[in-house]
């Protein structure tokens, strides 16, 4: 089996995380997984949604979108259609769930964190790149809250979160699929993990042929290997 990119089966794409990418957001990152590029921002606003009022905890919510020409052919803006598509809703819920797992909301205070992930170029793995980049932006946003005198109850950050895709391509497990691989893969799996080794979410679909338990175990092992490298990259970016 030869991957279109020439990478080894267990090799990630080149990953870059650029912090403080935009001027106004409390946390902002440009994350690049190969040719997939996503701008992730975290905005801080006082107050919480109505369903959390009086409960003494904060909240985090996420939105996701793609520029019309992030892909090979132009896609109509969802705003011009008047509603978000099912894929968009699914992905932004995944991003929100994943990042909430990083936080102790009771220590966040009366604050809502708005995570915005905007894909400027797509070549597979946009949701996993979004989670990975937004996590770094979230850490920076928490630092800003603390500088402003917030987080009186302590640090709400419990653990780092990252995500990566794995799949079965031509009968073999591969790590971090690009678009060519993703479109031809027999199985596509998105894995979200914590820096302590726990799983937050595993989303998997057999596109061409059913995958077997041994295949699943092999894909998860690949994801764990890749995640170790991604957490190192996140930490290196935050150390700059």
Swiss-Prot record:
GO BP term, pick one: rRNA catabolic process
Disulfide bonds: none
EC number(s) from the headed UniProt entry: 2.7.7.56
GO MF annotation, one: 3'-5'-RNA exonuclease activity
Uppermost EC category: transferase
Keyword terms of this UniProt record: Nucleotidyltransferase, RNA-binding, rRNA processing, Transferase, tRNA processing, tRNA-binding
Positions with a binding annotation for phosphate: 87, 125-127
Pfam families: RNase_PH, RNase_PH_C
Domain of life of the native organism: Bacteria
Reactions accelerated catalytically: tRNA(n+1) + phosphate = tRNA(n) + a ribonucleoside 5'-diphosphate
PROSITE patterns: RIBONUCLEASE_PH
Similarity comment: Belongs to the RNase PH family.
Subunit structure: Homohexameric ring arranged as a trimer of dimers.
Entries under NCBIfam families matching the protein: RNasePH
Role description: Phosphorolytic 3'-5' exoribonuclease that plays an important role in tRNA 3'-end maturation. Removes nucleotide residues following the 3'-CCA terminus of tRNAs; can also add nucleotides to the ends of RNA molecules by using nucleoside diphosphates as substrates, but this may not be physiologically important. Probably plays a role in initiation of 16S rRNA degradation (leading to ribosome degradation) during starvation.
HAMAP family: RNase_PH
Name assigned to this protein: Ribonuclease PH
Annotated organism of origin: Pseudomonas fluorescens (strain SBW25)
Encoding gene (name): rph
